[in-house]
Structure formats: C-alpha cells, structure tokens
Amino acid sequence: MCQVGEDYGEPAPEEPPPAPRPSREQKCVKCKEAQPVVVIRAGDAFCRDCFKAFYVHKFRAMLGKNRLIFPGEKVLLAWSGGPSSSSMVWQVLEGLSQDSAKRLRFVAGVIFVDEGAACGQSLEERSKTLAEVKPILQATGFPWHVVALEEVFSLPPSVLWCSAQELVGSEGAYKAAVDSFLQQQHVLGAGGGPGPTQGEEQPPQPPLDPQNLARPPAPAQTEALSQLFCSVRTLTAKEELLQTLRTHLILHMARAHGYSKVMTGDSCTRLAIKLMTNLALGRGAFLAWDTGFSDERHGDVVVVRPMRDHTLKEVAFYNRLFSVPSVFTPAVDTKAPEKASIHRLMEAFILRLQTQFPSTVSTVYRTSEKLVKGPRDGPAAGDSGPRCLLCMCALDVDAADSATAFGAQTSSRLSQMQSPIPLTETRTPPGPCCSPGVGWAQRCGQGACRREDPQACIEEQLCYSCRVNMKDLPSLDPLPPYILAEAQLRTQRAWGLQEIRDCLIEDSDDEAGQS
C-alpha cells in the first residue's frame, strides 16, 4: 500500500528554470560567428547585422506576399511620432534608396496629425511638439503634411462616402505592372537622365518651413474640439471617437493629394491588443478589417499595415540599435489608470500575460490571421448595403429587427416625443421640410422635423459598437458638421426611397402567373 510521504522519484522543480542569458561565449544563431547583441525570444540571440536583416526581411515579406501596392502608386505614411510608425517610415526610406538590394517602387508621402487639442495641450506645448516633428519630416525627403485634428470641422460630407473600389489585379497583372515599370525605368536610364528614387519622377520637395502647413488652427475650431471631447463621459468613448476622427482626416488628405494607399504602423503587439479590445467593444464582425493587413472599407483608399509581423520588443531594439528618431506625443489615455478604459484594461491584461507566457501575443496575432473577410448575410450584405456613419463598416444591426434592445429604446423614445396629431394634418404626407444643409440643432421644428428624434435617426445609421459609444455623448451639437449633414442626407434619402416604393404598383401573384 502507498504510504504518506513515500518518495518514488526526484521531486519536481517548483518553477521552470530561467531562460539562459547571452554570454560572451554564445554566438549569433544566424551567422554562428558574431557576438549577439539582442535576444528576441528565449534562445534567439542575434548580432547587429543579422538582426537588421531579420527585421527588414519581415517588412519586405509582408509587402511582397500581399502585392497590393503597385509600382508607381502613391502611398501616404501615417506617422504619429511613436516607435512603430517611426520604424515604418525608416523602413520605407531605406527601401526607396538607390543602394537597396530590392528597391521599393512606390511614391511615398508622410502625414502627421496634431491631436494636442483633444489631449488638453496648450498652444505652447503643441508648438514645441511641432518643432520636434518638422525636422524629422524634412529629413525623410518625402512630401509631408502636418494637419491639426481641428480640421475635421471643415471636412465635407463626402468623406463618409464609400467610393467605387478598383478591382485588385491578379498575380499576373502585378507582374505585368512590374515589367512595364522596369521597362520604363530602362528607357529613362538609357536616355541619360537621372533615374527617380521613388518609382517615378521625383515630386518637388517641400520648402524647409512651409507656412501653409505651420499655421495654427482657428481658435473657434480648437474650442469646438475641446468641447466635443469634454462632453464625452467615458475614456473608452473618447479613444474611439479620436480614432474615428483621425481616420476621417487622414482619408480626406489622402484623397485630396491623390494617394490610393495609407500605411499605418500597427505592430503585432498593438494588433493583438486591438483584437481583444474590439471583441469587448462589440466589433467582432469587423475584426478582419480592423486587424488584417489591408482594410478596403473606404473603397478608393486602402489602409495597409506592413508592421503587423513586428512585436514592440523588436521595434524597440531596432530603433535603439539604428538610432531611428521618434517623438513622444501624449495621448488621451496618457497617465490614465489601468481600469480607466477598455483599451487600457486590455493593454495591461495582454502585456501582463506576455511577461508570464511569452507566446501570448503571437497566439492572439495568429488567430487574427485566420479571420476571413466575408459578406454579411441579410439585407445589409454586399458593397451597396448600408454602412455605419462613423466607422464605415457594413451595419451589423438590422433596422427591421424590432426585438433588439436598440429597437425597443428607439420606439420608446419616439412614442414619448410624438405628440397627438390632428386629423387635418394626417392627410399631408410627412415629408422633409428642411434643406440638407441645415443641422439638427437648427431644424424648423415642424412636420417631419418635429416628429423625428435626431438621436434616434443617427443611432439607426450606426453599427452596434458605435451605438454603444454614442450613448456617452449626451448631445449631438458638439459633433463635427460633416457627420450631422451626412446623417440628415441619409435620412432624407431613405425617406424619398420609401415614398417611391409606396407609389409603385406591384403585380399580384395571379397576374404574374397569367403573364
């Protein structure tokens, strides 16, 4: 029989042995000769040259296997000043240089969005940040744009329109485009002229201090933006609103200057955190667009994420070893406690798990790679279906589904606001009585304007996640005018289509059978 305390073997260790640290006798795992300087994972020690080759190969492989950027295409690099986006700009800068082995063949530009007003910075602090940003942008040699977030108050409603998307060519079309590009370069080189360095004729370089880009925003717009973010109740809704406005502004700048692609510096770690955050926010239907390599929801401008294979640890090592310049800019969640928002909570959760289980980020990231972009079944399926007013994704909430919580809330709100209507007024169809340019706050208060709830009209044009975030905005007045104008245009367009359907005569089943 077994006895208490009887030993049948050696006792198991209480905790796993620590990972071996690189010593002077250890060599690089790649070249087996040089002394390692960084340890990416347990046992993966690289020397300086091998680590650079490993890092650059990841970036080139991500662009090469997807083949979405054609030669000569204009690409806008969204630079925030952080480590990942700075490393992305540096990779593009080196890839477009003449001494690169496999040179990139697109035309690059850089954009920086000044978000100081949303973060509560003063004009002096914002000017100091811009003074650090402009020398870095000038050093790249790319055409660059510095825009303030306040410019969202001057955007047109067309920024929320999904333009027709050009069909992406097959692999044969991409190879044909490359061959045609190389043939053009050979002809230019044979003519004796200097070859371009970015895939086509070098665009004119911006002046050293372009005054049109350095002008401060209007004080009225700064006050309006501050009022908007101060009116939002939760930090989670503030971060989502900031991301939405930033995306709309970058999208407008890309269209205005002829860019068909936008590169963002989302790293593997950041995308893993974003995946878990979006699941908690109710954006599970859009994970393939929010975390994938390409995001085609905007139609004519495609967002790509070439840094999605690099972890934050690799980015930090590369920037440190090769002196990649970056600028620290405070965000809305800077110095916020861990449980201040869903974004901060998920970030702390993932990073804490990563320290204990080093494969956490890679596991979540590999899961996101398996997500496929598929059309949604139902009335909202297809590219021509209704889209969210803010995130521009296909609506995941059917307006005809009265069993949803939002349908019940909307019906309750409308029943409370609707006043008794005399019989003489029921003979007149309730059509829109205000012009499309009139905002919700300035509507006349008669006819359909009196019976419609502006909050409900906007909520029915939002996806589930954006509806939840809109609950933290007590009033619609602080929203930028282009959002309110587009919401009113969609409402009037839907009313007009419904009126046309009511006037159409449908064939009965008997008449259809006889014909």
Curated annotation (Swiss-Prot):
Domain of life: Eukaryota
Main localization category: cytoplasm
Pfam families from the UniProt entry: CTU2
Region described as Disordered: 1-24, 188-217
Keywords: Acetylation, Cytoplasm, Phosphoprotein, Primary microcephaly, tRNA processing
Post-translational modification N-acetylcysteine, affected residues: C2
Any one GO BP annotation for this protein: tRNA thio-modification
Modified residues (Phosphoserine): S415, S419, S435, S508
Disulphides: none
GO MF, one annotated term: nucleotidyltransferase activity
InterPro entries: CTU2, Rossmann-like_a/b/a_fold
Subcellular compartments: Cytoplasm
Classification via HAMAP family: CTU2 (MF_03054)
Function: Plays a central role in 2-thiolation of mcm(5)S(2)U at tRNA wobble positions of tRNA(Lys), tRNA(Glu) and tRNA(Gln). May act by forming a heterodimer with CTU1/ATPBD3 that ligates sulfur from thiocarboxylated URM1 onto the uridine of tRNAs at wobble position.
Subunit structure: Component of a complex at least composed of URM1, CTU2/NCS2 and CTU1/ATPBD3.
Involvement in disorder: Microcephaly, facial dysmorphism, renal agenesis, and ambiguous genitalia syndrome: An autosomal dominant syndrome characterized by primary microcephaly, ambiguous male genitalia, dysmorphic facies, polydactyly, and unilateral renal agenesis. Variable brain, cardiac, and skeletal anomalies are present, including corpus callosum agenesis or dysgenesis, lissencephaly, atrial and ventricular septal defects, patent ductus arteriosus, hypoplastic right ventricle, and joint contractures.
Similarity field: Belongs to the CTU2/NCS2 family.
The protein, known as: Cytoplasmic tRNA 2-thiolation protein 2
Organism: Homo sapiens
Gene: CTU2
